[in-house]
């Protein structure tokens, strides 16, 4: 709550005075935009109004909050699921296993929803903004957490710590960063490739960097 809500309120308070200096089409439906921000429903607001992340025809001041909306949906719903599993599991290892399996299943469903959906629609805005189709990177993070550990370091991280020297560790991190840079410059939101493989590659690159950073933390 304290990490998300106060910055969102501050963002709206700081942004609104500047609306006096921009074109009126930016503030059209501003009430709905603000409601979407505070309700963490900006992604659905953009879908209902026909918005596009790169659109110059329907500019919205808070369009970037679509990703925060997806994040909050994940935190609330997945948090409840993990809480329920924690009450049913008999050990931490059993809980980790159940979280891993459910995260994998949710990742597969979400990814293929975007993959198949992007082949069936004329405008990709719906699959781009939808929580169902764009939540799979968070489940990759859940999978990674069960593999590398959160409070306690897993055996996998310890193994990488033993087998990787500092140079190899940094190279793995740099490889993930390079993939993200290449995707940034060469893949646009209008490309079908972005929805079929681009976002997946970006997510895998980010996971690789997180893993490398975790191993590097153990080394230092």
PLM segments and residue spans:
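Hydrophobic membrane-embedded alpha-helices
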Residues: 2-220
């Amino acid at each position: 709550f304290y990490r998300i809500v106060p910055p969102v309120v501050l963002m709206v308070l700081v942004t609104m005075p500047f609306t006096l200096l921009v074109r009126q089409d930016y503030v059209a439906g501003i009430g709905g935009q603000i409601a979407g921000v505070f309700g963490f429903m900006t992604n659905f607001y953009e879908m209902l109004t026909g918005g596009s992340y790169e659109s110059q025809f329907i500019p919205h001041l808070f369009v970037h909050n679509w990703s925060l909306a997806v994040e909050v949906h994940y935190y609330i719903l997945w948090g409840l699921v993990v809480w329920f599993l924690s009450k049913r599991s008999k050990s931490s290892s059993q809980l980790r296993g159940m979280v891993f399996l459910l995260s994998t299943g949710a990742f597969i469903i979400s990814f293929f929803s975007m993959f198949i959906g992007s082949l069936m629609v004329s405008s990709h805005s719906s699959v781009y903004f939808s929580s169902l189709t764009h939540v799979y990177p968070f489940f990759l993070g859940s999978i990674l957490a069960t593999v590398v550990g959160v409070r306690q370091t897993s055996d996998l991280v310890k193994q990488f710590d033993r087998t990787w020297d500092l140079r190899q560790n940094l190279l793995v991190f740099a490889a993930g960063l390079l993939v993200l840079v290449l995707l940034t410059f060469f893949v646009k939101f209008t490309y079908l490739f972005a929805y079929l493989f681009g976002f997946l590659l970006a997510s895998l690159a980010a996971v690789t960097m997180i893993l490398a950073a975790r191993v590097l933390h153990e080394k230092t």
